[in-house]
């Protein structure tokens, strides 16, 4: 499965309780509809925007990392579009994290093979 990162910004005039509910709904949507495995949810809170969006100078930022086969990401895009509380969103495939994970797995496999070789040579 591939690793993805999605970041979205919720309008700051939405209540804190409603913003928390929206984040949970996105997580649930990813798990149930996209069949993704959500790994981390990182709430940044209300931050100043780089530029004004509509009438807003601030927004509530959230970043989610999840694993998915890539199917259903268009459904996530549509989910954000139909909910006016979301000002901006973007989803990226994190190939850098995938490479890092593969590299670590190869190193671990290499270490395991070295340990087996050392054990075999010490028993002879």
From Swiss-Prot:
- CDD domains in UniProt: bS6
Locate the transmembrane regions by residue number: none
Pfam families from the xrefs?
Ribosomal_S6 (PF01250)
Signal sequence range: none
SUPFAM superfamilies hit by this protein? Ribosomal protein S6 (SSF54995)
Q: Out of the domains of life, which is the source?
A: Bacteria
Q: Which GO terms describe its biological process?
A: translation
Q: Does the keyword Cell inner membrane apply?
A: no
The record's GO molecular-function terms, alphabetically, read:
small ribosomal subunit rRNA binding; structural constituent of ribosome
* Entry keyword set: Ribonucleoprotein, Ribosomal protein, RNA-binding, rRNA-binding
Q: Where is the composition biased (Polar residues)?
A: 110-124
One GO cellular component term of this record is:
ribonucleoprotein complex
Q: Where is this region: Disordered?
A: 100-124
Record-stated family: Belongs to the bacterial ribosomal protein bS6 family.
Q: What does this protein do?
A: Binds together with bS18 to 16S ribosomal RNA.
List the HAMAP family. Ribosomal_bS6 (MF_00360)
This protein is called: Small ribosomal subunit protein bS6
User: What organism does this protein naturally occur in?
Assistant: Fervidobacterium nodosum (strain ATCC 35602 / DSM 5306 / Rt17-B1)
